[in-house]
Amino acid sequence: MAGLAASFGSGAMTNSITDLIESDCFLITGSNTTENHPVIASVVKRAITQRGAKLILADPRNIELAKFATVWLRQKPGTDIAWINGLLNIIIAEDLLDKEFVAERTENFEALKLAVAKYTPEFVESITSIPGGDLVKAAHLYAKAGAASILYAMGITQHITGTDAVKSLANLAMLTGNIGRPGTGVNPLRGQNNVQGACDMGCLPVNFTAYLQVANEEHRRKFEDAWGVSLNPKPGLTIPKIIEGADTGAIKALLIMGENPMMSDPDLAHVEHSLSKLDLLVVQDIFLNETGSLADVVLPACAWAEKEGTYTNTERRVQRVRKAVNAPGEARDDWQILTMLANKMGADWKYVQAKAIMEEINSVTASYKGITYERIADTGIQWPCPTLEHPGTPILHSAIFTRGRGLFSVTEYIPPAEQTDDQYPFVLTTGRILYQYHTATMSRRSQGLVSRTPEAFMEINPADAGELGIKNGEKIEVSSRRGSITLRADVRDRVDRGVVFIPFHYSEAAVNRLTITAIDPIANIPEYKVCAVKIQKCS
């Protein structure tokens, strides 16, 4: 989000899911779209099989989409900026750029041109292991397409250079004029059904709603006037900084809502140690998860079918959610719990229904001003929707970028924070699988899903497994400099030599006991996708 906001002025999917069918070429990277966003993957596949669209896939794993790819760029994990800058280099060197778009709608092109000059196919191959010829072919496919679309997810962002990698993708779209039209754009596929909505509503430590900045006096005054309070001008803390604060004693109490850091955060031993130092830990959730087990107080929340409200999905579509069943026991809507807590602490909040909160959102959020429960009763509306007469905005940046001109950012390849060595010779990358969801608080309660993927596993290349004497299905121990887990080996060529993959859904073999706490300095996202590990058979 920070990368797109810097480049375009808006950190969201530029296009709509339905108009992806009009793409002539897709560049998909950092996204196992078939397993993590299957509906979107079906649109991509239809464009390929029915319209003849081309697919450039950049992924270190042999995922299902590889069989649909015209070119598969199998990069080393953590080398994304190098190969993206390589594409930029080729497009500029071979005069494949959209000169009119660059001149009329962007700035800082000359600095970009100078910066990417060294990223020749040969130089990129030395970093990424992508054959130079494949990189050239990909550059031509993307630049010469009538409409080319970029899709990416957390495989791009969960690195110490994640923000810069997204800026590089934005550079690529602007360089070729692939923005603001059907079938084009830069499209982040969000990790959960309402991540976009949560960010829109200010669930980011630096922002109010609609990405107005906490540190900006004019922005802050707007919310002070609306709420009748004085607001702290200092931005809040990101999750890594919160855990750090708990460890140092700077943070004494913590309320965790709908989050499971004892599964989702890196270096879980450190997380557990830090949370244990709190004077008070309150967890608000629908099930007692691994984090809830450490809590002093647990507040029972409502599940999606038990409450009213809206979700804003990955294409910025605000959709209505209606209560279908009553919540069990003492479970309450999140807004009700927060209202009760606030009033206990001396506030005078008068919310009595979710609709009143939506009306407040309309009053302080320009991009949601024209979105009401009545208007989104059926199909939802895509923001920005500034008036009650406005139809919504399926495609962003058609005539002008949110920031005015699009900004070409200079980015450089920086190696991952942790490198392999003789003691820890394998690169571990992590992610999701089709049959489980995030920390599996909900999905592992489904026997149907559990039956498909009953236990934790690690993908390892057959050549590597052979050298270690490991057979498919055998128990193995995987260790990093931070911890160890035991799980089963899944021996197949889905990963390249020297790389292993473990999904993060399994509490009995929580892969985040291994991952590193290094973070992107801008977005503060941990580097979940690269750390060094060693592997041995269990005796």
Regions flagged by a language model, labelled:
Residues M1-N194, M201, Q213-H390, L428, ...:
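Cofactor-pocket helix-loop regions in the catalytic cores of large enzyme subunits
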Residues Y142-K144, T420-D422, E527:
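Solvent-exposed loop and beta-edge segments used for protein-protein assembly and interaction
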Residues G180-P182, D422-Y424, K529:
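Short, basic and Ser/Thr-rich N-terminal targeting/leader segments
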Residues G197, N207-Y211:
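Acidic, glycine-rich segments within the central catalytic cores of soluble metabolic enzymes
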Residues E224, P415, P521-I522:
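Short, P/G- and charge-enriched loop/turn segments at secondary-structure junctions
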Residues L299-P300, N512, A518-D520:
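Catalytic alpha/beta core of large soluble enzyme barrels
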Residues E374-P462, E467-T515, Q536-C538:
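Long, compositionally biased stretches
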Residues D520-S539:
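Long, low-complexity intrinsically disordered regions
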